[in-house]
Amino acid sequence: AAFGAAALKLPTDATLIVQPLWGSIGFTLPAAYGAQIAAADRRVVLIVGDGAAQLTIQELGSMLRDKQRPLILLLNNEGYTVERAIHGPEQRYNDIALWDWNRLPDAFAPDVPSRCWRVTRTHELREAMNSSVASDRLTLVEVMLPKMDIPDFLRTVTQALEERNSRV
């Protein structure tokens, strides 16, 4: 998700927090939890891939327990697409268990209201986003994507890696 987020045009008062240097997938969910604690008066928007989210999903329970209201855009491409782009799209180790993401908030905190969406089309995403802007509860929007739907920036990086590695 960091490769796509790097290309976003954000409002001047927005802050983008990413940690791409060490390739530490799973960082953003707990980072969003901490960011919401640090800036309780602001709305955190988390963009996270499904593979990364599976590594630290327990922090969703902390967010709900503390009644945080982030907007979570979970990009579901059924695995580690960055790794697929680098190591090949058919490598089995880049596949993950398929979860029912919209049931997780209730599993972690059944008494805390939340809102969940699963979207497959642009107009559904717009509807979910418009409904979520003023929401007073945690909102999870599962965005269904093709396995190899990658941003141009990532495509450029992986092509450069392939060229470099082919000369070795």
Residue ranges and their predicted role:
Residues F3-V168:
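Thiamine diphosphate
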